[in-house]
Design a protein with these regions (language model features):
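Short, structured coil segments at secondary-structure junctions
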Residues: 63-65, 73, 170-174, 227-228, ...
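Conserved acidic, metal-coordinating active-site core of Asp-based
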Residues: 104-215, 219-227
Length: 271
Protein backbone atom coordinates (compact mmCIF):
# COMPACT_ATOMS: atom_id res chain seq x y z
CA UNK A 1 0.00 0.00 0.00
CA UNK A 2 1.15 3.56 -0.70
CA UNK A 3 0.71 7.09 0.60
CA UNK A 4 0.80 10.61 -0.83
CA UNK A 5 4.09 12.47 -0.48
CA UNK A 6 3.55 14.55 2.70
CA UNK A 7 5.28 17.48 0.95
CA UNK A 8 2.97 17.39 -2.08
CA UNK A 9 0.91 20.55 -2.58
CA UNK A 10 -2.42 18.83 -3.15
CA UNK A 11 -5.33 21.01 -4.26
CA UNK A 12 -7.90 18.49 -5.50
CA UNK A 13 -8.99 14.98 -4.49
CA UNK A 14 -11.33 13.16 -6.91
CA UNK A 15 -12.97 9.94 -5.74
CA UNK A 16 -15.03 7.34 -7.55
CA UNK A 17 -17.93 6.18 -5.40
CA UNK A 18 -18.94 2.51 -5.70
CA UNK A 19 -16.09 0.15 -4.87
CA UNK A 20 -13.85 3.09 -4.00
CA UNK A 21 -15.11 5.73 -1.56
CA UNK A 22 -18.22 3.89 -0.39
CA UNK A 23 -17.87 1.03 2.08
CA UNK A 24 -18.83 -2.59 1.51
CA UNK A 25 -22.49 -1.73 2.17
CA UNK A 26 -22.49 1.04 -0.42
CA UNK A 27 -22.52 3.77 2.24
CA UNK A 28 -20.35 6.80 2.94
CA UNK A 29 -18.26 5.84 6.01
CA UNK A 30 -19.14 7.88 9.10
CA UNK A 31 -15.55 9.03 9.56
CA UNK A 32 -15.42 10.41 6.02
CA UNK A 33 -17.00 13.71 7.00
CA UNK A 34 -14.22 14.61 9.41
CA UNK A 35 -11.55 13.83 6.82
CA UNK A 36 -13.34 15.91 4.18
CA UNK A 37 -13.66 18.80 6.66
CA UNK A 38 -9.89 18.70 7.16
CA UNK A 39 -9.28 18.71 3.41
CA UNK A 40 -11.56 21.70 2.92
CA UNK A 41 -9.94 23.53 5.84
CA UNK A 42 -6.66 23.28 3.91
CA UNK A 43 -8.26 24.58 0.73
CA UNK A 44 -8.27 21.15 -0.94
CA UNK A 45 -11.29 20.47 -3.14
CA UNK A 46 -13.04 17.17 -2.53
CA UNK A 47 -14.73 16.01 -5.75
CA UNK A 48 -17.03 12.99 -6.09
CA UNK A 49 -16.57 11.53 -9.60
CA UNK A 50 -19.19 8.96 -10.44
CA UNK A 51 -21.53 7.44 -12.96
CA UNK A 52 -24.27 8.57 -10.61
CA UNK A 53 -26.63 11.43 -11.38
CA UNK A 54 -25.68 14.98 -10.36
CA UNK A 55 -28.81 15.34 -8.23
CA UNK A 56 -28.03 12.06 -6.45
CA UNK A 57 -24.45 13.11 -5.66
CA UNK A 58 -25.53 16.57 -4.56
CA UNK A 59 -27.99 15.02 -2.10
CA UNK A 60 -25.42 12.51 -0.82
CA UNK A 61 -22.98 15.33 -0.06
CA UNK A 62 -25.51 17.99 0.92
CA UNK A 63 -23.77 18.39 4.30
CA UNK A 64 -20.78 19.90 2.48
CA UNK A 65 -22.75 22.70 0.84
CA UNK A 66 -21.91 23.58 -2.75
CA UNK A 67 -19.02 21.45 -4.01
CA UNK A 68 -17.63 20.46 -7.39
CA UNK A 69 -19.09 17.22 -8.76
CA UNK A 70 -18.22 15.05 -11.76
CA UNK A 71 -21.43 13.17 -12.57
CA UNK A 72 -22.81 10.74 -15.14
CA UNK A 73 -19.38 9.22 -15.86
CA UNK A 74 -17.93 12.59 -16.83
CA UNK A 75 -20.68 13.86 -19.12
CA UNK A 76 -21.43 16.76 -16.77
CA UNK A 77 -19.25 18.75 -14.35
CA UNK A 78 -20.73 21.16 -11.84
CA UNK A 79 -19.08 23.52 -9.36
CA UNK A 80 -21.90 24.29 -7.00
CA UNK A 81 -24.75 25.29 -9.32
CA UNK A 82 -22.38 26.43 -12.09
CA UNK A 83 -22.03 24.08 -15.04
CA UNK A 84 -18.36 23.76 -15.98
CA UNK A 85 -18.82 21.20 -18.73
CA UNK A 86 -21.40 18.93 -20.34
CA UNK A 87 -21.63 16.76 -23.44
CA UNK A 88 -24.94 16.14 -25.21
CA UNK A 89 -25.77 13.04 -27.28
CA UNK A 90 -27.32 13.42 -30.72
CA UNK A 91 -31.06 12.57 -30.56
CA UNK A 92 -30.72 10.04 -33.39
CA UNK A 93 -28.12 8.12 -31.36
CA UNK A 94 -30.40 8.19 -28.32
CA UNK A 95 -33.19 6.54 -30.33
CA UNK A 96 -30.76 3.92 -31.65
CA UNK A 97 -29.88 2.88 -28.08
CA UNK A 98 -33.54 2.82 -27.04
CA UNK A 99 -34.34 0.47 -29.91
CA UNK A 100 -31.29 -1.73 -29.24
CA UNK A 101 -32.21 -2.22 -25.58
CA UNK A 102 -35.80 -3.04 -26.46
CA UNK A 103 -34.51 -5.78 -28.76
CA UNK A 104 -32.49 -7.46 -25.98
CA UNK A 105 -34.99 -8.24 -23.27
CA UNK A 106 -33.38 -11.69 -23.09
CA UNK A 107 -30.70 -9.91 -21.02
CA UNK A 108 -33.34 -8.50 -18.63
CA UNK A 109 -32.27 -5.07 -19.85
CA UNK A 110 -33.70 -1.84 -18.50
CA UNK A 111 -32.70 1.57 -19.87
CA UNK A 112 -32.21 4.88 -18.09
CA UNK A 113 -31.72 7.97 -20.25
CA UNK A 114 -30.14 10.84 -18.40
CA UNK A 115 -30.78 14.55 -18.68
CA UNK A 116 -28.74 17.01 -16.66
CA UNK A 117 -31.15 17.00 -13.70
CA UNK A 118 -33.68 14.23 -14.42
CA UNK A 119 -33.42 10.61 -15.54
CA UNK A 120 -36.16 8.85 -17.47
CA UNK A 121 -37.29 5.21 -17.60
CA UNK A 122 -40.02 3.34 -19.48
CA UNK A 123 -39.74 0.25 -17.30
CA UNK A 124 -40.92 0.56 -13.70
CA UNK A 125 -41.13 -2.94 -12.23
CA UNK A 126 -39.90 -3.26 -8.64
CA UNK A 127 -36.71 -5.17 -9.48
CA UNK A 128 -35.54 -2.59 -12.00
CA UNK A 129 -36.48 0.43 -9.91
CA UNK A 130 -34.59 -1.00 -6.92
CA UNK A 131 -31.50 -1.19 -9.12
CA UNK A 132 -32.03 2.37 -10.36
CA UNK A 133 -32.79 4.05 -7.01
CA UNK A 134 -29.25 4.29 -5.53
CA UNK A 135 -27.92 6.05 -8.62
CA UNK A 136 -30.85 8.14 -9.86
CA UNK A 137 -32.90 9.91 -7.21
CA UNK A 138 -34.55 12.27 -9.69
CA UNK A 139 -36.19 9.75 -12.02
CA UNK A 140 -39.40 9.99 -14.04
CA UNK A 141 -41.43 7.19 -15.63
CA UNK A 142 -42.62 7.76 -19.20
CA UNK A 143 -44.55 5.48 -21.55
CA UNK A 144 -42.06 5.91 -24.40
CA UNK A 145 -38.45 7.01 -23.92
CA UNK A 146 -38.21 8.10 -27.54
CA UNK A 147 -40.72 10.87 -26.76
CA UNK A 148 -38.55 12.50 -24.06
CA UNK A 149 -37.66 16.10 -24.91
CA UNK A 150 -34.47 17.90 -23.90
CA UNK A 151 -30.75 17.18 -23.87
CA UNK A 152 -29.58 13.66 -23.03
CA UNK A 153 -26.01 13.36 -21.76
CA UNK A 154 -25.74 9.64 -20.95
CA UNK A 155 -27.67 6.40 -21.20
CA UNK A 156 -27.32 3.54 -18.74
CA UNK A 157 -28.49 -0.04 -19.22
CA UNK A 158 -29.10 -2.32 -16.24
CA UNK A 159 -28.82 -6.05 -16.94
CA UNK A 160 -28.86 -9.34 -15.07
CA UNK A 161 -25.90 -10.95 -13.32
CA UNK A 162 -23.05 -11.86 -15.66
CA UNK A 163 -24.61 -10.13 -18.66
CA UNK A 164 -22.86 -6.77 -18.84
CA UNK A 165 -20.38 -7.78 -21.52
CA UNK A 166 -23.15 -9.39 -23.58
CA UNK A 167 -25.09 -6.14 -23.40
CA UNK A 168 -22.04 -4.04 -24.24
CA UNK A 169 -21.35 -6.23 -27.27
CA UNK A 170 -24.99 -6.06 -28.35
CA UNK A 171 -25.08 -2.25 -28.36
CA UNK A 172 -23.95 -1.69 -31.93
CA UNK A 173 -24.41 2.06 -31.70
CA UNK A 174 -22.35 5.10 -32.81
CA UNK A 175 -21.39 5.83 -29.22
CA UNK A 176 -18.78 4.92 -26.64
CA UNK A 177 -20.00 1.94 -24.61
CA UNK A 178 -18.46 1.41 -21.16
CA UNK A 179 -19.00 -1.29 -18.55
CA UNK A 180 -19.44 0.82 -15.42
CA UNK A 181 -20.49 -1.80 -12.87
CA UNK A 182 -21.42 -5.43 -12.38
CA UNK A 183 -24.94 -4.73 -13.68
CA UNK A 184 -24.47 -1.50 -15.64
CA UNK A 185 -23.40 -0.56 -19.16
CA UNK A 186 -23.17 3.15 -20.05
CA UNK A 187 -23.35 4.78 -23.48
CA UNK A 188 -22.12 8.31 -24.18
CA UNK A 189 -20.33 10.24 -26.89
CA UNK A 190 -16.91 9.02 -27.98
CA UNK A 191 -14.02 10.62 -26.11
CA UNK A 192 -16.16 11.53 -23.11
CA UNK A 193 -15.05 10.11 -19.77
CA UNK A 194 -14.17 11.06 -16.21
CA UNK A 195 -10.65 12.00 -17.28
CA UNK A 196 -11.90 14.62 -19.74
CA UNK A 197 -14.26 15.95 -17.09
CA UNK A 198 -11.49 16.12 -14.49
CA UNK A 199 -9.30 17.97 -16.99
CA UNK A 200 -12.04 20.54 -17.56
CA UNK A 201 -12.35 21.09 -13.82
CA UNK A 202 -8.57 21.30 -13.35
CA UNK A 203 -8.36 23.92 -16.10
CA UNK A 204 -11.21 25.93 -14.62
CA UNK A 205 -9.58 25.92 -11.17
CA UNK A 206 -5.96 26.29 -12.31
CA UNK A 207 -4.93 22.98 -10.75
CA UNK A 208 -2.20 20.72 -12.18
CA UNK A 209 -1.85 16.92 -12.36
CA UNK A 210 0.84 17.14 -9.67
CA UNK A 211 -1.70 18.80 -7.35
CA UNK A 212 -4.36 16.17 -7.98
CA UNK A 213 -5.15 12.88 -6.22
CA UNK A 214 -7.50 10.34 -7.81
CA UNK A 215 -8.96 7.10 -6.43
CA UNK A 216 -10.73 4.51 -8.58
CA UNK A 217 -11.48 0.83 -9.02
CA UNK A 218 -13.28 0.15 -12.32
CA UNK A 219 -12.50 0.58 -16.04
CA UNK A 220 -14.70 3.69 -16.24
CA UNK A 221 -12.10 5.31 -13.94
CA UNK A 222 -9.13 4.60 -16.24
CA UNK A 223 -8.86 7.97 -17.97
CA UNK A 224 -9.30 9.80 -14.67
CA UNK A 225 -6.58 7.64 -13.13
CA UNK A 226 -4.25 8.78 -15.92
CA UNK A 227 -5.01 12.47 -15.27
CA UNK A 228 -3.32 12.67 -11.87
CA UNK A 229 0.20 12.20 -10.59
CA UNK A 230 -1.16 10.71 -7.37
CA UNK A 231 -3.42 8.07 -8.94
CA UNK A 232 -4.55 5.28 -6.61
CA UNK A 233 -6.17 2.00 -7.57
CA UNK A 234 -8.03 0.34 -4.74
CA UNK A 235 -6.74 -3.06 -3.63
CA UNK A 236 -10.04 -4.44 -4.94
CA UNK A 237 -9.62 -2.71 -8.33
CA UNK A 238 -10.09 -4.24 -11.75
CA UNK A 239 -6.70 -5.44 -13.14
CA UNK A 240 -6.71 -2.74 -15.85
CA UNK A 241 -7.07 -0.02 -13.26
CA UNK A 242 -4.43 -1.55 -10.99
CA UNK A 243 -2.01 -1.58 -13.92
CA UNK A 244 -2.73 2.03 -14.91
CA UNK A 245 -2.48 3.62 -11.45
CA UNK A 246 0.77 4.86 -9.95
CA UNK A 247 -0.14 3.73 -6.43
CA UNK A 248 -2.36 1.29 -4.53
CA UNK A 249 -4.77 2.06 -1.68
CA UNK A 250 -6.34 -0.46 0.71
CA UNK A 251 -9.70 -1.90 -0.34
CA UNK A 252 -12.90 0.12 -0.08
CA UNK A 253 -14.09 -2.33 2.57
CA UNK A 254 -11.13 -1.15 4.67
CA UNK A 255 -11.92 2.53 3.99
CA UNK A 256 -8.75 2.74 1.92
CA UNK A 257 -9.40 6.24 0.57
CA UNK A 258 -9.72 7.59 4.09
CA UNK A 259 -6.59 5.77 5.24
CA UNK A 260 -4.51 7.39 2.50
CA UNK A 261 -6.00 10.86 2.98
CA UNK A 262 -5.65 10.71 6.76
CA UNK A 263 -1.96 9.80 6.42
CA UNK A 264 -1.42 12.81 4.14
CA UNK A 265 -3.26 15.18 6.46
CA UNK A 266 -1.17 13.94 9.38
CA UNK A 267 2.09 14.22 7.43
CA UNK A 268 2.79 10.49 7.53
CA UNK A 269 4.65 8.59 4.82
CA UNK A 270 3.19 5.27 5.98
CA UNK A 271 -0.39 4.11 6.54
Amino acid sequence: MHTIDPNAQIKLVAVDMDGTFLDGNGQIPDEAWGVIDQLQARGIKFVPASGRQFVTLREQFAALGEIAIIAENGTVVMDGEEEIYSNVIDPAAVKTVIEAVREHQDLDAGLVICGRRTAYVERNDEKFMQAVAPYYRAVKFVEDLSEVQGDIIKMAVNVGTGQVQDMADALEVPLQVVVSGTHWVDAMNHGVHKGLALGALQKELGITDDQTVVFGDYPNDLEMIKAATYSFAMANAHPEVAAAANFTAPANTEHGVLQVLRAYLEGRSQL
